Amino acid sequence: MNDVATIHATEREQARMGDLLELIPSRGESVLDIGARDGYLARLLADRFTRVVALDLVRPDVADPRVESVEGDATALNYADDAFECVVCAEVLEHIPEASLERACHEIIRVARHAIVIGVPYKQDLRYGQSKCQACGRINPPWGHLNVFDEHRLEALFGAVTPARFSFVGHNRDRTNAVSAGLMRFAGNPYGTYDQDEPCVHCGAKLQPPNGRTLVQKIATKAAYTIERVQQAFVTERANWIHARFDKVAERVGGGEP
């Protein structure tokens, strides 16, 4: 399990959080933080907004009287239309099953009155760092991420609102290829993201690394890494995250008067 306090203190995480805050209004009446987890961002937002609601699938435990913690689902938000001046949804959409993704984005647009700020991984290679569930035997994407995003996909998902700004944070060279990914699967995916908090996306069991590998599996693992090292010479570095600010314009969302 990850130590969230240690993660928040890292330079990488501080850069991500700082960039998000640049996109969020400097002051306002109300904000909804979807996927609040430990409430780190919600506490920062309490310095800017009169009302802060921290929402997650499990009610966040936020030790700040300025923050209202609630249990909720991004695909079915229990709030009226235009309920919040700003809605922030960071590190969430990549976890939502494809069949429910458009619904979640629709809900975000519906409850936002003015600003929407989204943060997701940028062009992530979901083959890199796969794990294998020891309970059901199925392959899991890294960190429980189910979707891949770039600016074009975000614009399509949030087509009812106006894109105001995109920003790109961090650096990433994590890439693999079909051959290496296949060899890793044969080897039992021994080096997947087993320290993640997210359970198996198929059966809900906690992910555990395999107990051991045969000699042939070890050879397959080494071959996979060798091919990836060769590939790295041709990999172009790109951002780790993409952040987007959308502004809700009444005429665009509702159509306005003819």
Task: Give each language-model segment a name.
Residues 88-99:
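A short SAM/SAH-binding and catalytic strip from SAM-dependent methyltransferases
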Residues 1-88, 102-105, 134-137, 141-147, ...:
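Conserved N-terminal segment of class I S-adenosyl-L-methionine
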Residues 117-141, 145:
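Conserved class I S-adenosyl-L-methionine
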Residues 52, 116, 161-166:
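Hydrophobic anchor at the start of a short beta-strand
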Residues 61, 124-126, 175:
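Feature marks short, surface-exposed loop/turn motifs that line or immediately flank catalytic pockets
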